[in-house]
Amino acid sequence: MKIIFLLQFTSLLSMLINAMLLGLGSLHVRWKNRRYEQSRWMLFAAMLILAAHFLAQMTLSVRASGADLGAVLNLLAYPPSFALIALSIYNIEAVHDNRRRFVAGIVGLYAIIVVCYAIGYCCNGSMRIGMWMYVMLALYICLVVYCICKASRQILVRRKLLETLTASDMLPHVRFAKTSVTVLFVASMTMPFVILFNKILVIYAPVILLAIFFFVLTFCNLG
């Protein structure tokens, strides 16, 4: 399990580096946009949540005790961090201020995930919650799909608006941002299946870390 520990340590450092890039990047912005800065700190919070998650995995040796235990902890930590990332995208791309409905959907789905964990814990007396883990997994996928649909719709609307109102030289920048978001979403959709198997996780996790780092760099370039 040494390789799992090294992977968790690498993930922890990666999230801290991402958070540092986002936090220090704010100091170099001369003219600040309110929505962009809101999204920056949403991403910053998401990176800190993930960093805290990997630190907990390391100190508690959860995944070393079993892939199922690690998966349960992942399913509790990933939804809020992914939701913050999706909300940061939505916050920038939305042409109208309709975030409350989006946030309400996210909070509702995550609340159900937590309730499922609580029921499984009460029924089994430990974090080995059996079939309830798969219920949590299904709900996480629903949350990811919900966020993808909402954010992608706003990206499409904004793209059409830019095509109509701005010069064409803005479009490569928009396509670059869309590509990074797509990579991140694909990683988020495949991750629930990977976390159940340690051997696959060791191979696939570096791809996820690179996708998140690429997304953070893209976000910083937008500023």
Name each region found by the language model.
Residues L27-M42, A67, Y90-F102, S126-I129, ...:
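Membrane-interface helix-boundary motifs at transmembrane edges
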Residues A67-L69, I129-C147:
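Alpha-helical transmembrane segments
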Residues T10-H28, Q38-S61, A77-A83, G108-G120, ...:
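Hydrophobic alpha-helical transmembrane segments of multi-pass membrane proteins
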Residues M1-A19, L137-I141:
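Hydrophobic transmembrane alpha-helical segments in integral membrane proteins
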Residues D169, R175-G223:
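Interfacial "cap-and-anchor" motif at the non-cytosolic start of specific transmembrane alpha-helices
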Residues I17, L73-L84, V135, L139, ...:
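Membrane-embedded alpha-helical segments of multi-pass membrane proteins
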Residues Y90-G120, M131-Y140, T164-L184:
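The cytoplasmic-loop to transmembrane-helix boundary for the fourth helix
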Residues N18-G25, L143-R159:
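Membrane-water interface of transmembrane alpha-helices
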